[in-house]
């Protein structure tokens, strides 16, 4: 194998562990995710279809994989410190914030990786981007002591957000998902109520639990076609908080913003990394201080994850995109 020559600010990383992001499953299917794509393709374009001009927002958008970590084995001549501070050394264990991690070795700019904190295991540190994003979201979702919280979507990130609500002193925490296995994890983590949205209307169930008042904080961690976002809006109480984590890929054509105005809702963007590079790094370091202190139960996350080898990746995507809404495991881990 011939490894590429490094530019001055680049490093070569040997992969220890990567993982699959939920968004990549949609991209793999060629799902049309941006309003501008739909406009370009015309009124006939629907979620899950490529525009007529063949410019689908499809997978891969770039080099394969953006979750993972490994060991720095070579450095460019201009590499001195990480963005945000800290000397860079050969042998450092690092987590990735961007492509390309679905490979044995990868080259990236030093701005796009961060050292795994000393108090965090290698395996947990290789979840740097997804875990950091979820932990930061849990810190900024707006939970207060005594709140009633609903987490709509309890996959990997949703179950981190759910733990954040419990640790923050919520009086009731409601977990919602279409997959019973994920709800079982949420229950084991301490959810007071679990609602299987494939069996009952989750909005009606929340209304019954809250005696018609709604929840103080509605967390949207489903993403996808936007149904979870509409449900979260229908669950939140007057003057409540709508905390948006999931990436909703399709335009929501019938969506009334009047409730935001009339009910004085607090709307929070819980995406940690779509900011300036330095601010994104600050968010991740803030999140990992909490991870390093053992606030979250991560053992149960790994217990309910699945592991594959890198050469099995094509089969992984074929299998996991067959039923996008029924993914049973919390995280799919890829080993070189």
Question: Which ranges hold each PLM region?
Answer:
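Glycine-rich beta-strand-centered segment in the early N-terminal region that forms part
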Residues: 4-19, 31-98
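C-terminal hydrophobic helical "lid"/dimerization subdomain
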Residues: 201, 230-234, 238, 277, ...
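Residue-level marker of beta-strand positions
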Residues: 92-93, 105, 136, 148, ...
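Glycine-rich cofactor phosphate-binding loops and adjacent beta1-alpha1 units
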Residues: 141-144, 189-267
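A structural motif shared across PLP-dependent enzymes of the aminotransferase-like
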Residues: 98-110
């Amino acid at each position: 194998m011939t490894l590429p020559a490094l530019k001055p600010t680049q490093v070569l990383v040997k992969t220890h562990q990567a993982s699959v992001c939920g968004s990549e499953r949609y991209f793999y299917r060629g799902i049309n995710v941006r309003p501008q794509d739909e406009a370009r393709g015309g009124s006939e374009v629907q979620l899950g279809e490529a525009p007529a001009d063949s410019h689908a927002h499809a997978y891969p958008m770039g080099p394969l994989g953006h979750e993972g970590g490994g060991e720095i084995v070579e450095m460019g001549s201009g590499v001195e410190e990480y963005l945000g501070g800290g000397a860079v050394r050969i042998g450092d264990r690092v987590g990735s914030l961007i492509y390309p991690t679905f490979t044995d070795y990868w080259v990236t700019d030093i701005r796009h990786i961060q050292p795994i904190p000393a108090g965090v295991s290698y395996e947990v540190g290789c979840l740097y981007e997804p875990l950091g994003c979820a932990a930061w979201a849990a810190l900024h979702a707006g939970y207060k002591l005594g709140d009633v919280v609903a987490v709509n979507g309890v996959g990997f990130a949703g179950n981190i957000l759910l733990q954040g609500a419990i640790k923050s002193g919520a009086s009731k925490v409601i977990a919602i998902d279409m997959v019973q296995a994920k709800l079982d994890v949420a229950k084991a983590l301490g959810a007071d109520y679990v609602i299987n949205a494939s069996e009952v209307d989750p909005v009606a169930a929340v209304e019954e639990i809250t005696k018609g008042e709604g929840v103080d904080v509605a967390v949207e961690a489903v993403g996808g076609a936007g149904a979870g976002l509409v449900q979260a809006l229908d669950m939140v109480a007057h003057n409540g908080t709508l905390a948006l984590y999931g990436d909703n890929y399709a335009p929501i054509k019938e969506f009334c913003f009047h409730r935001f105005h009339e009910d004085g809702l607090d709307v929070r963007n819980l995406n940690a990394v779509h900011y300036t590079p330095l601010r994104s790094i600050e968010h991740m370091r803030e999140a990992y201080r909490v991870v390093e202190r053992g606030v979250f139960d991560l053992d149960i996350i790994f217990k309910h994850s699945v592991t594959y080898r890198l050469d099995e990746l094509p089969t992984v995507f074929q299998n996991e995109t067959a039923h996008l809404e029924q993914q049973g495991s919390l995280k799919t881990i890829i080993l070189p």
